Amino acid sequence: KNLKSSTHKEVDDDLKVVNSLVDQLAQVNKLIMSGGSKNSSPDILDARDQLLLDLSKYINFTVDYGDSNDAIVRLGNSGNGKILLEKTNKSVLTSNVQEGRLIFNISRNAINSMNNDISSGLLFGAKNFYDFVGEVESEINQLAFRLSQDFNEIQQNGIDLNGRTGMSMFSIDSM
């Protein structure tokens, strides 16, 4: 349980970084759009490109450029994913757990929706790890339950040194 909790916290921390990078990109887009496509300084464009590079460590996305050379960022690899940033309008990524699995959500203009477009990067790896830990935990619990049943059966069929029938070794009511 601690491993899942710490992984979920790590995902939430990474999402804060992602959302901060998107905020910074929105500010850079604002600077780019105020200068026009021909007047954008190379330093501003370099800053935008560095922010996009930093973002790519966490999530996969595609980028198109608007008339003013502003970045339009969509989640996923298809170019048709949900919009993370368009001009200065940004979305917010969050996570929650549903049925033991980690789910990413995207919120834009107070509209929330589930997102399945993230398929690489640190966040995707952490999500897969979280889900894997849950599956392994379930399998270990099933194995422990079966072992305790088998031990109890063997114990109950045996006789102790005083000739008494054995009693259950494990209480499996709580398993």
Residue ranges and their predicted role:
Residues 31-175:
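Phosphate-proximal small/polar/acidic motifs at interfaces that engage nucleotide phosphates
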Residues 1-32:
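Long, non-coiled-coil amphipathic alpha-helical linker/lever segments
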